């Protein structure tokens, strides 16, 4: 029998997902049909302390408590009831970074987030040692950099985890981590669905001369796949989340996951030959692979889905920020002319007008580098618009080049997967700000990666919904379905979203554009060198 939202909450059948993102902590309650029924949130910011980006442990708990309190308030105002118990809980957070604890469970140095780039020496050395691409932001890079820097705390490490792993440990007592989040600490062996034992052994041998009391295996969280038992909410955990004291202990908690994994779940992209692209301030693509790549590539990170399939991730620092800055110039023009401003209309008109331009943007090129872009080898960036005197300079081409630029670096990374590795995909789902204007961002991305792109209404629900779905998979998967089948049958039920396929003309035009773009990169390098 289907219960209404109020009865679902009162019967303890609702499921809670909480995600700690870089600017917001979001909580969502879902019903027995896996649909969101109420949300809560808390806004927070990272701090730069001693040259490193961090959030304090106090800020983590204050943020979680405030987010949960906001959820409680919304439950009260919408349904006039109280959350006493739940069918399951899931916690997810931004991946990677460094949270190291001693045996008294005290944090040894402030949490170092994924944003820190002080690990280049360690990442380069480990990439060579492991014969695998080890990004700067991965936990193992942070650990080895601390060792290289002879940091005092290293001998005292008893446990090393991610933000999601930390919160889960504190509310359940379990030192575990979902496989997707674990794959951002250290590479995963797709066969054993555990940390690569070869790499763990190599690391221990590398640091053996230091004589630490610990081995790498001893300090890492146990790896779990989606649906596995990851512990229960303890009385201390319940009071840490809900300071009002209403929430009861004993609720099952699913394996904690990273934001990449919850994004895959929220877009129904955990099956092999599917993928998703997140395109907002920054962008990334995640393609679920059928087999390992033939060799490591510096611009492709290897992670996994929450159930352990290999994923090739291309991450770009820049996406829509420069595009938005140009849109604001047109907004200023309208205000100057005394024309009423409707931002949705400005975006809609300019984006759609871009589609009337030349497929190769008439020769115009844009570099949208607000910050550096590792894939194209730039440590810093300067937004740059470049044209020759005889290019076709008009508004449609001007807007089109800025739309192309928003996914240009993403194309360069994905061209390796599709052209060199011959990866095949059946469906890619897009989500994020670039797709807000119907059909335009989709068509541009379809041309960039020569693949049909779907957009779903629910994609905007994001990671908190994704981790709630993983908690639902733990609680409601009575007949042992795979995660992909569970999502297909019980969540998305045939909703593949609205799909746009690339046209031959757009694909050919984008390919011409990207060759000019790559040839012109020294212009961007010069801008970085000479423009303060």
Language model features with spans:
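N-terminal glycine/serine-rich phosphate-binding loop of ATP-dependent small-molecule kinases
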Residues: 1-110, 124-125, 156, 217, ...
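Glycine-rich phosphate-binding loop of ATP-grasp-fold ATP-dependent ligases
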Residues: 109, 181-188
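Conserved alpha/beta enzyme-core scaffolds, especially Rossmann-like or related mixed alpha/beta domains
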Residues: 178-181, 213-225
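Active-site core segments that coordinate phosphate-bearing ligands/cofactors
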Residues: 2-10, 16-17, 83, 121-177, ...
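Conserved phosphate-binding/catalytic loop of the ribokinase/pfkB sugar-kinase fold
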Residues: 113
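Carbohydrate-associated surface elements
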Residues: 116
């Amino acid at each position: 029998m289907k219960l209404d939202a109020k009865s679902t909450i009162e019967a303890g059948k609702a499921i809670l997902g909480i995600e700690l993102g870089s600017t917001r902590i979001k909580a969502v309650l879902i019903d027995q049909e896996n649909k969101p029924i109420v949300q809560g949130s808390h806004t927070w910011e990272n701090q730069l302390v001693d040259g490193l980006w961090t959030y304090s442990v106090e800020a983590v708990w204050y943020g979680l408590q405030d987010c949960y309190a906001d959820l409680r308030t919304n439950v009260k105002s919408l349904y006039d009831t109280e959350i006493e118990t739940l069918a399951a809980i899931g916690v997810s957070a931004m991946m990677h970074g460094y949270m190291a604890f001693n045996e008294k469970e005290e944090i040894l140095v402030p949490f170092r987030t994924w944003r820190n780039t002080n690990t280049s020496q360690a990442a380069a050395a480990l990439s060579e040692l492991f014969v695998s691409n080890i990004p700067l932001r991965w936990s193992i890079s942070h650990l080895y950099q601390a060792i290289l820097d002879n940091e005092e705390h290293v001998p005292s490490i008893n446990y090393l985890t991610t933000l999601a792993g930390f919160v889960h440990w504190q509310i359940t007592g379990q030192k575990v981590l979902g496989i997707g989040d674990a794959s951002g600490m250290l590479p995963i062996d797709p066969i054993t669905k555990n940390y690569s034992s070869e790499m763990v052994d190599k690391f221990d041998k590398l640091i053996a001369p230091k004589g630490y009391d610990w081995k790498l295996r001893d300090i890492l969280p146990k790896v779990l796949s989606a649906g596995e038992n990851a512990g229960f909410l303890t009385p201390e955990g319940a009071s840490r989340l809900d300071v009002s004291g209403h929430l009861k202990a004993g609720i099952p908690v699913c394996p904690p996951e990273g934001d990449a994994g919850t994004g895959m779940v929220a877009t129904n992209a955990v099956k092999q030959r599917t993928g998703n692209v997140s395109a907002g301030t920054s962008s990334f693509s995640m393609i679920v692979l059928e087999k390992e790549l033939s060799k490591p590539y510096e611009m492709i990170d290897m992670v996994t889905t929450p159930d352990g399939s290999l994923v090739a991730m291309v991450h770009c620092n820049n996406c829509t920020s420069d595009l938005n800055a140009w849109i604001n110039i047109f907004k200023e023009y309208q205000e100057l002319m005394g024309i009423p401003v409707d931002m949705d209309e400005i975006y809609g008109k300019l984006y759609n007008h871009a589609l009337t331009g030349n497929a190769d943007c008439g020769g115009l090129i844009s570099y949208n580098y607000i910050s550096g872009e590792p894939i194209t080898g730039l440590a810093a960036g300067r937004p740059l618009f470049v044209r020759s005197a005889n290019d076709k300079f008009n508004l449609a081409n001007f807007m089109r080049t800025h739309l192309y630029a928003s996914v240009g670096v993403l194309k360069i990374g994905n061209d390796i997967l599709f052209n060199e590795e011959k990866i095949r995909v059946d469906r890619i789902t897009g989500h994020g700000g670039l797709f807000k204007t119907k059909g335009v961002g989709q068509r541009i991305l379809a041309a960039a990666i020569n693949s049909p792109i779907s957009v779903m209404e629910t994609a905007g629900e994001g990671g908190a919904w994704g981790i709630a779905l993983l908690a639902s998979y733990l609680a409601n998967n009575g007949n042992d379905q795979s995660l992909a089948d569970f999502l297909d049958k019980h969540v998305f039920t045939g909703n593949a979203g609205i799909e746009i396929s690339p046209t031959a003309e757009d694909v050919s035009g984008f390919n011409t554009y990207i060759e000019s773009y790559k040839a012109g990169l020294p212009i961007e390098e010069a801008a970085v060198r000479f423009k303060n």
